[in-house]
């Protein structure tokens, strides 16, 4: 059995994804500052009190160093939807490490240890916020509200992202999915028995009975687009809905019906039923867009 394999491409990092997103800029800045406070205070506390110092705090600092870098890279490369599950798992581990470090440092009446504990408390607070953000669906009201403050930024992916993750399979060609159903008529010459006995139908057992209904002979009617199956979809004239793009999308160059759009771009939508919506951009360009990349306003 053959399966269609999705195409993967490396997304280029852009510092604008951090600067243009107030939430990402604020949380990463606070986390970095808290880590620096804990790092410096931990070294000072270890030098002043080397005997009873909890060395466990060093492992927490190393773990959070990689965790903050990972969050920065994921947000900068606009790959949140791809790695959000892994991020939530690592953030959960980091929350355990930071709270344990606070418990080991805050009870001593020593300035350096208390400063280190304060830094770990800030890290714990940022971690809780990150878990809520990355663990929520993009359509969740709190996350959609936070994302609404981010500037529009387009992801520059070298390969087109497939739709297998959202619906479990590839989308059929849209050029043949809108053809009207073909109509067929059959001529009835008499009453027929679907279960003949002895190979004889009801019409043969009593030939004197005239047929109850005889339909006029008709011909098979072909669909209007049967001669040209690759015809493009005719766009509608009314677009009563408005939707906001929660991810960037690059149209398939082999399908003329799809349109590309950037993250946070506003689109007009004519119909919200189905997996693909007929949409129109502000520039007037029309086409179909994946519904799981959009959120209604």
UniProtKB/Swiss-Prot annotation:
Organism of derivation: Chaetomium globosum (strain ATCC 6205 / CBS 148.51 / DSM 1962 / NBRC 6347 / NRRL 1970)
Keywords from the UniProt entry: Cell membrane, Membrane, SH3 domain, Stress response, Transmembrane, Transmembrane helix
Record flagged with keyword Protein transport: no
Domain of life from the UniProt record: Eukaryota
Purpose: Plasma membrane osmosensor that activates the high osmolarity glycerol (HOG) MAPK signaling pathway in response to high osmolarity.
Cytoplasmic domain ranges by topology: 1-23, 76-81, 136-297
Official protein name in the record: High osmolarity signaling protein SHO1
Ranges of the Extracellular topological domain: 45-54, 103-114
Domain SH3: 238-297
Self-association and partners: Forms homooligomers.
Record's keyword annotation contains Membrane: yes
Location of this chain's protein in the cell: Cell membrane
Protein family per UniProt: Belongs to the SHO1 family.
Coiled coil ranges: none
Transmembrane segments: 24-44, 55-75, 82-102, 115-135
Membrane topology label: Multi-pass membrane protein
GO cellular component: plasma membrane
